[in-house]
């Protein structure tokens, strides 16, 4: 976490999990920002519909968007994956 004039910030490295090239974006946001806003911004950066995206950890654990960015950073770390919801689930 880094300290600025407007409060502490957290930095996330968000990888687009659905792309074979694994592109990523690095986002720095205020730690009190709602994580749903982080998901929305990350999806827009990858030109995806935010309403159809989710963020997961590298281990595949889904992250509840009702938390703050700081809470997510403390629980899950800075390396996260953005995945379109049409790719979430299991196929036989």
Swiss-Prot record:
<dbReference type="InterPro" id="IPR029071">
    <property type="entry name" value="Ubiquitin-like_domsf"/>
</dbReference>
<keyword id="KW-0833">Ubl conjugation pathway</keyword>
<dbReference type="InterPro" id="IPR005375">
    <property type="entry name" value="UFM1"/>
</dbReference>
<feature type="propeptide" description="Removed in mature form">
    <location>
        <begin position="90"/>
        <end position="92"/>
    </location>
</feature>
<dbReference type="GO" id="GO:1990592">
    <property type="term" value="P:protein K69-linked ufmylation"/>
</dbReference>
<dbReference type="GO" id="GO:0005634">
    <property type="term" value="C:nucleus"/>
</dbReference>
<comment type="function">
    <text>Ubiquitin-like modifier protein which binds to a number of as yet unidentified target proteins.</text>
</comment>
<keyword id="KW-1017">Isopeptide bond</keyword>
<comment type="similarity">
    <text>Belongs to the UFM1 family.</text>
</comment>
<dbReference type="GO" id="GO:0005737">
    <property type="term" value="C:cytoplasm"/>
</dbReference>
<feature type="cross-link" description="Glycyl lysine isopeptide (Gly-Lys) (interchain with K-? in acceptor proteins)">
    <location>
        <position position="89"/>
    </location>
</feature>
<protein>
    <recommendedName>
        <fullName>Ubiquitin-fold modifier 1</fullName>
    </recommendedName>
</protein>
<dbReference type="Pfam" id="PF03671">
    <property type="entry name" value="Ufm1"/>
</dbReference>
């Amino acid at each position: 976490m880094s300290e600025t004039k407007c409060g502490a910030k957290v930095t996330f490295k968000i990888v687009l999990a659905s792309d074979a090239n694994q592109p990523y974006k690095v986002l720095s946001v205020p730690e009190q920002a709602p994580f749903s806003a982080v998901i929305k911004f990350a999806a827009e950066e990858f030109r995806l519909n935010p309403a159809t995206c989710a963020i997961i950890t590298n281990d595949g654990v889904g992250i509840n968007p009702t938390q703050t960015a700081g809470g997510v950073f403390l629980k899950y770390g800075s390396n996260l994956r953005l995945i379109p919801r049409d790719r979430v689930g299991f196929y036989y």
